[in-house]
Amino acid sequence: MSTQSLYSVPADIAANALVNNEQYQKMYQESVANPEGFWGEHAKRIDWIKPFTQVKDTSYDDQNLYIKWFHDGTLNASANCLDRHLASKGDDVAIIWEGDDASEQRKVTYRELHAEVCQFANALKAEGVKRGDVVTIYMPMVVEATVAMLACARIGAVHSVVFGGFSPDSIASRVIDGKSKLLITADEGVRGGRKIPLKGNIDEALNRPDVTTVETVIVLKRTGGAVNWVEGRDKWWHQVTDGAATECAVEEMGAEDPLFLLYTSGSTGNPKGVLHTTGGYLVYASMTHEYVFDYKPGEVYWCTADVGWITGHSYMVYGPLANGATILIHEGIPNFPSPARLGEIVDRHQVNILYTAPTLIRALMAEGKQHFDNFDGKSLRIMGSVGEPINPEAWRWYHEVIGHEHCPIVDTWWQTETGGILITPLPGATDTKPGSATRPFFGVQPALVDNEGNILEGATEGNLVLLDSWPGQMRTVYGDHERFVLTYFKTFRGMYFTGDGARRDEDGYYWITGRVDDVINVSGHRLGTAEVESALVAHDLVAEAAVVGYPHDIKGQGIYAYVTLTKGTEATEELRQELRQWVRKEIGALATPDLIQWASGLPKTRSGKIMRRFLRKIAANEITNLGDASTLADPSVIDTLIESRLNRAD
């Protein structure tokens, strides 16, 4: 193996790890050669009401596409996360919660969590929620967000969690798509010292004339702040649960029954509802959580992701709780009120495993390591990275300053669509290289292909595809199976196309190079450029807009918008700021353009297609080698854009 920047598995980790390198090789070969035998055995890690007899029934044929795992088995996800732990660890802590203000702390045992989930499940049933109904959850990072999810799973309802930073329009589009009759929210959220008007945003979303299905809004009293109230529709959480029974029988669900929807950005049009089912997802989330983080009973596990993202679903809720872990939930942001907060939380709660994002690591790095002078960190054993490729400088800083050079880093690559981690080191098995996601998890078969779909061998670079299914894979786009087929299986026949590019080095390690479609990765969160463009063009003074990502020191990628104004409109700094606020209101703060460049024209082919590769290069200040511009209707547009670019190095 090439030794350049190679970090070997620490001896103490290797000696006690669940999997060493030899075991990894053996298990991986078995998982690929005999997936039915491998997954049939490992699916026993969760409790089945009716055991399955068939393991894998999948087809990647785009004319006849289907994905089924364990499909004749039945189970309940809530029971797997709660009930099965009561006898052996009912009094163990399931959730440690710390508020945005560190003075607010709460510990919830498995027995207490079970009772709360049952009460809320009974309340949902009393409000008329039935098996298969989609319940929309728009909550802050409080214990009750997890309670709401598990209560839905308990009664067979499908939860659709919306990130608490999204705008009323984003909420509305998800409610409409899911036809939700019931919403769950809080009066306000608290994040970074600021109050977020969650109920106010819900009210605004529900005031839209095209939102017609919602009958009930359950509101958690988080801050006690003033809220508008719609009699008959709005109900307080504490009132609907008051007196509700603390036992609730679980609904027996088929392995292929939906567990949740989670909307993710596509390269075109509206966000798509990624549908995950119950059996395969839970097997995969729990198994990856245990093996990737080398989780040992009794350890405190902290995933810093918001519950509104897939990482929060798989590695804050379902994976860890199915494994009987103690999870830490932090309401705020880990660098508020100062960059020292992350270290303080780790020390205060003796966190053993930390799973966070490169964007936070880069933000802490920019503030300086002096903020960690008083950080002990001896409790930390394993650290993870998620959301986007981590640059080697940030990896090393994380390893040295947070991990004190003794914690293995698992740099994990996966997607909302994959349900769980696909390419990752295993702490006791994989020597790591800063910036590389390394090797595939069990049962995962990655390949690199050229633009014609030919498989590339050896050390090379190409489009990242997956050759066969795994249990955690999404099953469809909610209500639009054709979009599922078109998005993931039409580009390269017989393969799942990830939308990412990657290179494979001489050791077979994978390095993710980023999106190859029109999706931007901002602070580890995916945004479709089409969404941001649509928001800009909705403004009366904007004639046309093109949006691309560009390298950003903190966020990984920033949002760079080229805007053509309507005839006669003056391009002013005031208008630029107005457009930034406009997008923020339309989609959410995450989508706010970092840079808006006025453009009298955009580079288009004669057929009118915008050539984004030129825009990406200009935004990245890579102007010396733009490539062939002969297909453009007006090549002079390029010179004008270069001349007025905003992201200059000089």
Swiss-Prot record:
It catalyses: acetate + ATP + CoA = acetyl-CoA + AMP + diphosphate. One of its GO terms (molecular function) is AMP binding. The modification N6-acetyllysine is found at K609. Acetylated. Deacetylation by the SIR2-homolog deacetylase activates the enzyme. ATP binds at G387, E388, P389, D411, T412, W413, W414, Q415, T416, D500, R515, R526. CoA binds at R191, G192, G193, R194, T311, N335, S523, R584. GO terms for biological process: acetyl-CoA biosynthetic process from acetate. The keyword Transferase does not apply. Keywords: Acetylation, ATP-binding, Ligase, Magnesium, Metal-binding, Nucleotide-binding. InterPro entries: Ac_CoA_lig, ACAS_N, AMP-bd_C, AMP-bd_C_sf, AMP-binding_CS, AMP-dep_synth/lig_dom, ANL_N_sf. Mg(2+) binds at V537, H539, V542. Disulfide bonds: none annotated. PANTHER family: ACETYL-COENZYME A SYNTHETASE (PTHR24095:SF243). Catalyzes the conversion of acetate into acetyl-CoA (AcCoA), an essential intermediate at the junction of anabolic and catabolic pathways. AcsA undergoes a two-step reaction. In the first half reaction, AcsA combines acetate with ATP to form acetyl-adenylate (AcAMP) intermediate. In the second half reaction, it can then transfer the acetyl group from AcAMP to the sulfhydryl group of CoA, forming the product AcCoA. This is Acetyl-coenzyme A synthetase. It comes from Shewanella amazonensis (strain ATCC BAA-1098 / SB2B). The lineage of its organism: Bacteria, Pseudomonadati, Pseudomonadota, Gammaproteobacteria, Alteromonadales.
